[in-house]
């Protein structure tokens, strides 16, 4: 869906709408998979968080998009660089009419501008730079923005097999895919969102860094930063022979933390 949407928008007399809204459960890899797919096909990504669209002043919400949009058009004209705008957590942006999102003059300007951009793209002689909107639930988006011709929808709800492949990709530089113990760990925790495993990977890096700080016996902060940087924690992690055991330990630790939060 991602590649078809992007390529289709660059075609002459494109039948594709400007916006593709990808929705699905939180933490299941929508952003990771979208950006990874773009990277695989050499598509430049202009990434924007939904929070960045909540400026304090009128038109603040579209300023960042407009400037980058002009840059993307020029890059395509000069160097044939295909690009896409990815707006993350769009369901939390001011384009939403959810009760939890305050509506302002800025909100009305943004939704109006987005609709106008989609409509103008059909007749513009300029290259069309497509948009991918990511979010958990788009049922509260301003209805005219989502009509046919402006926006397509795609639900991202990976099955267990797909989830396992994505999780393996997160760890592919450290653990072989055919490692049985690692496969067992994933299967045992497959009900957890993909973001859970991404955080496990981050926890492992933090543990390596903590170990290096303790073992260095250095008490100057600047020298500590230089020492840890020069030791390349990523390389250290790859050399760990107990990597799967380390992953299991981090999984158990994070599960305990989650259980503790639920009881509060």
Model-based region annotation:
Residues 80-85, 124-132:
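Loop/turn-to-beta-strand initiation segments
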Residues 47-79:
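Short glycine-rich substrate-engagement loop in P-loop NTPases that contacts/grips substrate
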Residues 91-127, 143:
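Conserved catalytic/switch belt of AAA+ P-loop NTPases
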Residues 2-13:
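Pre-Walker A adenine-sensing motif
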Residues 143-159:
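A short helix-turn-beta junction within AAA+ P-loop NTPase domains corresponding to the substrate/partner-engaging
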Residues 89, 129-138:
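A short beta-strand-to-loop transition that corresponds to the Sensor-1 phosphate-sensing loop
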Residues 12-48, 71:
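Walker A/P-loop
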Residues 161, 166-264:
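C-terminal alpha-helical "lid" subdomain
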């Amino acid at each position: 869906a991602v590649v078809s949407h992007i390529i289709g928008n660059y075609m002459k007399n494109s039948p594709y709408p400007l916006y593709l809204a990808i929705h699905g459960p939180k933490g299941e890899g929508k952003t990771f998979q979208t950006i990874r797919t773009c990277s695989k096909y050499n598509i430049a990504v202009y990434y924007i968080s939904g929070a960045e669209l909540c400026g304090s002043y009128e038109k603040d919400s579209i300023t960042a998009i407009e400037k980058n949009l002009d840059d993307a058009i020029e890059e395509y004209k000069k160097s044939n660089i295909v690009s896409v705008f990815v707006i993350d957590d769009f369901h939390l942006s001011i384009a939403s009419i959810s009760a939890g999102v305050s509506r302002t003059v800025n909100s009305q300007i943004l939704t109006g501008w987005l609709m106008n951009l989609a409509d103008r793209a059909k007749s513009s002689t300029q290259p069309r730079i497509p948009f991918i909107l990511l979010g958990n639930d788009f049922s509260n988006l301003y209805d005219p923005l989502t009509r046919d011709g402006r926006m397509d929808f795609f639900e991202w709800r990976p099955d267990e097999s797909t989830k396992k492949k994505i999780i393996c990709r997160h760890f592919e530089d450290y653990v072989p895919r055919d490692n049985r113990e690692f496969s067992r760990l994933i299967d045992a925790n497959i009900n957890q969102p993909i973001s859970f495993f991404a955080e496990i990977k981050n926890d492992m890096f933090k543990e390596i860094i903590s170990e290096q700080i303790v073992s260095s016996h250095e008490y100057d902060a600047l020298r500590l930063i230089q020492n840890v940087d020069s030791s390349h924690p990523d390389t250290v992690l790859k050399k760990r022979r107990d990597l799967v055991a380390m992953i299991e330990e981090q999984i158990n630790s994070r599960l305990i933390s989650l259980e503790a939060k639920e009881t509060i």
